[in-house]
């Protein structure tokens, strides 16, 4: 399991603003204190270890790492199966349509994707048609690669469990083909278009340390709760 340490602090220059507030400290923000019960739980149980039962948030270094391929000897092994099981569990609990291993703190090339009918029904018929939404069953891909089938760019809003509470318009290719292995090491090839192609591209980006905010139209970046703030 790869453990990531803290980011190195920037060089201290006498007489500079770094004496008063380093850029890293400014990024980290004020110190966060734990509740007594959280402290006791951590003391007794230890720190959580990946794969987490939560989704890592933007700012976590693991989301900016290029994920490593799963080695052949790891295929069908207990660690990979545990990772896949946790990914599916978290994805379904969060009600999202895709999740990558880095989002649970594991920088490996593993994706889980699923768009069940119950999530599709949350969208109006008009939006389903406009965004070319179709349900698909659970698919897990190991060491996936992507090929563009239709290079036309289509722009729609999307969000991410690792940038919780925000969305923005992002251009994506109309159709792609993803190929890789299933958790047992069997080859998988999947061609998709429309919204399914968007989901695939979004999750593939995670394996390259890329988030949707890197490709978004920044003028459309939206806090989903902005209206509540004004109430």
Swiss-Prot record:
It comes from the Eukaryota. Substrate binds at residues 59, 157, 159. The active site is at 203. Residues 153-163 are annotated as: Hydrophobic dimerization interface. Co(2+) binds at residues 160, 202, 206. It catalyses: N-terminal N-formyl-L-methionyl-[peptide] + H2O = N-terminal L-methionyl-[peptide] + formate. One of its GO terms (molecular function) is metal ion binding. GO terms for biological process: positive regulation of cell population proliferation; post-translational protein modification; translation. One of its GO terms (cellular component) is mitochondrion. Its cofactor is Co(2+). It holds the Pfam family Pep_deformylase. It is an enzyme of class 3 (hydrolase). Its EC number is 3.5.1.88. Removes the formyl group from the N-terminal Met of newly synthesized proteins. Belongs to the polypeptide deformylase family. PANTHER family: PEPTIDE DEFORMYLASE, PEPTIDE DEFORMYLASE, MITOCHONDRIAL. Homodimer. This is Peptide deformylase, mitochondrial. It comes from Mus musculus.
